[in-house]
A protein has these predicted regions:
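Alpha-helical transmembrane segments of multi-pass inner-membrane proteins
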Residues: 33-41, 65-105, 109-178, 295, ...
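Membrane-interface loop/short-helix elements at transmembrane-helix boundaries
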Residues: 210-248, 262-272, 276
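Transmembrane alpha-helices of multi-pass inner-membrane enzymes
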Residues: 41-44, 311-349
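A membrane-periplasm/extracellular boundary helix in multi-pass inner-membrane enzymes
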Residues: 178-220, 233-234
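Membrane-interface micro-motifs in multi-pass membrane enzymes
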Residues: 108-124, 274-278, 324-335
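Hydrophobic transmembrane alpha-helices and their immediate junctions
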Residues: 11, 25-27, 73, 277-314
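Actinobacteria-biased recognition of intrinsically disordered, low-complexity terminal regions
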Residues: 1-34, 135-139, 143, 181, ...
Length: 349
């Protein structure tokens, strides 16, 4: 009989199929996700209305997440081991074989930006460890965990210390997940960790930390990045409802205009959404992350698989708090795939 270790919903029937209560709960969670994503897409159109603010970038990101999630649900149901293992291997191979690998130059594979590549590798670590927990034999589990560790080492080789630290965190959380009896506590911990990261960046941007600590963090994050964050906070305060409009941060930001070769974003998903779509957009971003955690809580997969995926997605959220890695549709699609894999209901043997 299949069981969902530490799950929040009812147990499966003896024939391996979901019971009526579990199907209803899963449908409600899916409906909630649809409502959040559709609401966010609608709000982006409202924020763009009446001004030269194309919402294409956000709509593409939402489409990538949705398509990735659907793909992950299907692949995870059919191939609970091969699908996440294939995802992890594909990311690692793409990072290794593309021209300019490990150089940190403009053509660094596969996205042309080392930190975005590192974000993909964090997801690869999570996918490999999810596959390891679903693998039937200890040797295969060892191989898959080695693949996950290799993805983390590759992030360090690309020059992303934050990506390496996130991958190590995913590995440690995955190894510890078997000792967690209730997944809800761990998922709440992931939410709190993300909230602390967001609060910390806001404190740096508004210079509300003690002077010594603020100067130290600003030095590590770089002064131009912190200046962009301050511009974004100012825009959100001046335009709290609709923001300045999607894709208009660079036009409105003195810091971004000064750095003509820099990124057209505040290098933070949180600050970008707040500046360009106001506080309603920021609330929808938080609701989307909360929905992902709720989906993992209700997932019929084992607790180690769920918490491993949750750790990887939390690592990605922390990277997105201090960099614009979610501006890449490939990253958002990969995040959707991993969430779908962890939420899938494997078909009965």
């Amino acid at each position: 009989m299949r069981t969902a270790t530490g799950g929040a919903s009812g147990a499966m029937r003896a024939d391996g199929r979901d019971g009526p209560e579990e199907r209803v709960q899963g449908s409600r969670t899916d409906a909630l996700g649809v409502a959040v994503l559709v609401g966010w897409a609608t709000w982006s159109l409202i924020a763009a209305a009446g001004r030269p603010a194309p919402p294409d970038g956000l709509l593409l990101a939402l489409l990538a997440v949705t398509a990735g999630y659907a793909t992950g649900r299907i692949a995870g149901a059919l191939l609970p081991v091969a699908a996440p293992a294939g995802m992890a291997l594909a990311i690692v191979v793409a990072t290794l074989v593309m021209p300019g690998r490990l150089s940190g130059a403009a053509d660094t594979p596969p996205l042309g930006y080392p930190n975005a590549d590192a974000a993909l590798l964090v997801l690869a670590t999570g996918a490999a460890c999810c596959a390891a927990w679903s693998a039937p034999s200890p040797p295969l589990r060892l191989v898959l965990r080695t693949l996950g560790a290799g993805a983390g080492a590759l992030a360090l080789a690309l020059g992303s210390t934050a990506g390496f630290a996130a991958s190590v965190g995913v590995l440690l959380c995955s190894l510890a997940a078997s000792h967690m009896r209730r997944r809800l506590l761990a998922l709440v911990g992931f939410a709190l960790a993300t909230a602390i990261a967001v609060g910390g960046t806001y404190a740096v941007a508004t210079d509300t930390l003690p002077s010594g600590l603020s100067a130290s963090l600003a030095g590590q994050l770089t002064a131009p990045r912190v200046e962009l964050w301050r511009d974004a906070v100012g825009m959100a305060e001046d335009h709290p409802v609709r923001g300045v409009g999607p894709d208009r941060f660079r036009v409105e930001s003195a810091g971004a205009l000064a750095a003509t070769e820099g990124p057209p974003t505040p290098q933070s998903a949180v600050f970008q959404v707040a500046a360009e779509q106001g506080f309603p957009g920021l609330a929808l971003l938080g609701a989307a992350f909360a929905w992902v955690l709720c989906t993992l809580w209700r997932s019929p997969r084992s607790t180690p698989v769920v918490l491993t995926a949750g750790a990887a997605l939390t690592g990605l959220s922390m990277l997105a708090t201090v960099d614009h890695v979610l501006s890449y549709a490939v990253v958002t699609a990969a995040a959707g795939i991993l969430a779908g894999l962890a939420a899938a209901r494997p078909l009965p043997d």
